[in-house]
């Protein structure tokens, strides 16, 4: 019984969330929420593009919140800011970034997941991350290392986050990408990273 209660407490503090990518992009917003609910999840991730799809259905913010409330679900993850290290960011990327900030405010989400496909030096990337963190203000910027990206592993990810030296710059540790980057299973890669700098630990089916 004690373990069950502890599990429920942990689940309440950190809702079990299904990624926006897992649910795909070819369904209506309410169908997405229902599918996640029926599968036993407590929260859904939402990409900026998926949020725009919901608006394109004719939904307003109040409608989206009503659907979530109707099914006892929450949006618990917002993503995905990219190309934030470009010297001259496009208006589309600037708008998407602002949209992610709005989504965090709307859904009371504290963190935005971010990736970077382009490969730059640690120093340059850290400077651009610092600028992103300043724009994000109160929101956490979760940097996600991916083996096919410009931040391919936790080693470079931590070097960038450490050099950026921002309180709201943190790392996402995704076991799916971890395995595909051939990182050691003994976790030696993260032994020098403070625990409070790893903001998410994600596993995938």
Residue ranges with predicted function:
Residues 2-109, 166-170, 196:
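N-terminal pre-domain/capping segments
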Residues 205:
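Conserved small/polar residues in nucleotide/adenosyl-binding loops
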Residues 153-154, 183-190:
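Histidine/acidic-residue-rich catalytic or RNA/ligand-binding cores of hydrolases
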Residues 30, 67-74, 84-173, 179-180:
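Active-site acidic/histidine proton-transfer and metal-coordination neighborhood
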Residues 190-197:
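Short, conserved loop/helix-junction motifs that constitute active-site signature segments
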């Amino acid at each position: 019984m004690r373990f069950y209660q502890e599990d429920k407490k942990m689940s309440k503090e950190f809702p079990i969330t299904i990624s926006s990518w897992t649910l795909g992009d070819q369904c209506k917003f309410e169908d997405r929420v229902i599918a996640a609910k029926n599968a036993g999840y407590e929260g859904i991730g939402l990409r900026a593009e998926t949020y725009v799809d919901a608006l394109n259905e004719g939904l307003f913010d109040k409608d989206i919140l009503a659907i979530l409330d109707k099914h006892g679900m929450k949006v618990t993850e917002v993503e995905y800011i990219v190309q934030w290290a470009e010297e001259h960011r496009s208006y589309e990327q600037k708008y998407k970034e602002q949209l992610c900030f709005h989504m965090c405010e709307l859904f009371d989400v504290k963190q935005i997941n971010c990736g970077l496909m382009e490969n730059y030096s640690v120093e340059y990337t850290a400077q651009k991350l610092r600028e992103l963190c300043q724009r994000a203000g109160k929101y956490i910027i979760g940097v996600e290392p991916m083996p096919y990206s410009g931040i391919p592993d936790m080693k470079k990810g931590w070097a960038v986050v450490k050099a950026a030296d921002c309180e709201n710059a943190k790392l996402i540790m995704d076991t799916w990408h971890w395995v595909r980057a051939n990182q050691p299973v003994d976790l030696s890669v993260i032994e020098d990273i403070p625990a409070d700098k790893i903001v998410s630990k994600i596993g995938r089916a």
